[in-house]
Amino acid sequence: MSLAANIVIALVALLHVYFLVLEMFLWDKPAGLKAFGQTREAAAASKVLAANQGLYNGFLAAGLVWGLSLGDAGLSVKIFFLVCVLIAGLYGAATASRKILFVQALPAAIGLALLLLA
């Protein structure tokens, strides 16, 4: 596997750990409010949903780390989880914020392209 692809995949996994922390633990704190442009009231009303979404982001990170841990045998695992991240990013960009296209979908697409070209 390409070192560049694995570095990008690791960065995508780290991003999703960061999303997990923001959504599960910091959603209604100053860092979470700033990151998502939320008011305290809106954050309080959506806290449970955000925590659930954060958990899913943790599963994406875990899948990518699992794929990396398998070395060359993890190719299909990495492809699967990168495609999941890409689809989630495209959906988020279409329904929530265009910024998600660049923060989530683009890194996954770059990782997927590097992986397939390796």
Language-model features: locations:
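N-terminal signal-anchor transmembrane alpha helix
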Residues: S2-L26
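Core segments of transmembrane alpha-helices
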Residues: G54-V65, L106-A108
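Small-residue-rich segments of transmembrane alpha-helices in multi-pass membrane proteins
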Residues: P107-A118
